[in-house]
Curated annotation (Swiss-Prot):
Role played: Non-catalytic component of the RNA exosome complex which has 3'->5' exoribonuclease activity and participates in a multitude of cellular RNA processing and degradation events. In the nucleus, the RNA exosome complex is involved in proper maturation of stable RNA species such as rRNA, snRNA and snoRNA, in the elimination of RNA processing by-products and non-coding 'pervasive' transcripts such as antisense RNA species, and of mRNAs with processing defects, thereby limiting or excluding their export to the cytoplasm.
Protein's recorded name: Exosome complex component RRP40
UniProt keyword annotation of Iron-sulfur present: no
Name of the coding gene: Rrp40
GO biological process: brain development; CUT catabolic process; exonucleolytic trimming to generate mature 3'-end of 5.8S rRNA from tricistronic rRNA transcript (SSU-rRNA, 5.8S rRNA, LSU-rRNA); larval lymph gland hemopoiesis; mushroom body development; nuclear polyadenylation-dependent rRNA catabolic process; nuclear-transcribed mRNA catabolic process; poly(A)-dependent snoRNA 3'-end processing
Recorded consequence of changing residue 11 to A: Results in reduced viability, shortened lifespan, age-dependent wing posture and locomotor defects. Shows a mushroom body beta-lobe midline-crossing defect
GO molecular function: RNA binding
UniProtKB keywords: Cytoplasm, Exosome, Nucleus, RNA-binding, rRNA processing
Family: Belongs to the RRP40 family.
GO CC aspect terms: cytoplasm; cytoplasmic exosome (RNase complex); exosome (RNase complex); nuclear exosome (RNase complex); nucleolus
Alphabetized Pfam families for the sequence: KH_6 (PF15985), Rrp40_N (PF18311), RRP40_S1 (PF21262)
Native species: Drosophila melanogaster (Fruit fly)
Quaternary assembly: Component of the RNA exosome complex. Specifically part of the catalytically inactive RNA exosome core complex.
Knockout consequences: RNAi-mediated knockdown in the whole body, neurons, glia or muscles is lethal. RNAi-mediated knockdown in mushroom bodies affects the morphology of the alpha- and beta-lobes as well as ellipsoid bodies. RNAi-mediated knockdown in the wing pouch results in severe wing development phenotypes and increase of miR-252-5p expression.
Length: 232
């Protein structure tokens, strides 16, 4: 993943992406919009790029706006026929079919109840329809997606969520050197965390939350504080 030095403004045309789209598949993320054959920015901020062809604008926002391909954490709110209504922190609730889980069928439905936490991917998202979620990849396997049990759930800023999801994130690598854990991060500003004990889980959650104020530059200090806390 790379960050360009280009700052874009709403309505600005992004010619570089248009040119790239002529020779390869390009995916537009939050902050970018396709208008006929042109690509324009819909938000202000640094233009970001992830190989091979994903672009988005890293704009600070308080409310999550769903985009196709996003990894999110959702809370099941209700069942409606063959669908489950899921709170993903957006303006509208999302939906997920019982068939959107690995090995699901009419006779083998997932047993979800209100309050369950799921790690899912946004399949469809537009202004005209409610977001649709899936808990499987393109070959029908769940991977890390699905229902999350036990652990500790907390919220963070959308920017921190995106930072933690970057490939080779130095924060998660540094924390892994301190102790083993499981984590699921959503770009909708939600995190699920599970370590061997409650004390370790809370310590990790506090360390990650501290990044809201200090940033990656203080990760060594944060990890040091984590070690001191665990030894106390």
């Amino acid at each position: 993943m790379s960050a360009t030095s280009t700052i874009v403004m709403p309505g600005e045309r992004i010619a570089a992406i248009e040119e790239l789209a002529k020779s390869k598949r390009v995916i537009l993320g939050p902050g970018l919009r396709r208008l006929d054959d042109t690509v324009v920015a819909s938000k202000a901020g640094p233009l970001r790029h992830k190989e091979p062809g994903t672009f988005w604008v890293d704009n600070y926002q308080r409310r999550y706006i769903p985009a196709r391909g996003d990894l999110i954490l959702g809370i099941v709110r209700a069942k409606a026929g063959d669908l489950y209504r899921v709170d993903i922190g957006a303006t509208d609730t999302a939906s997920i079919s019982y068939l959107a889980f690995e090995a699901a069928s009419k006779k083998n439905r997932p047993d979800l109840i209100p309050g369950d936490l799921i790690y899912a991917r946004v399949l469809n998202a537009s202004a005209d329809i409610e977001p649709e979620l899936v808990c499987v990849n393109s070959v029908g396997k769940s991977g890390k997606l699905g229902v999350l049990t036990d652990g500790f759930f907390f919220k963070c800023s959308l920017n921190l969520g995106r930072m933690l999801l970057r490939e080779n994130c130095p924060v998660l690598a540094a924390l892994t050197r301190e102790l083993p854990y499981e984590i699921a991060v959503g770009v909708n500003g939600r995190i699920w965390l599970k370590a061997h004990s409650l004390k370790e889980t809370v310590a990790l959650a506090n360390a990650i939350s501290a990044l809201e104020q200090s940033g990656c530059a203080e990760i060594d200090k944060i990890c040091g504080n984590l070690g001191d806390f665990l030894q106390a």
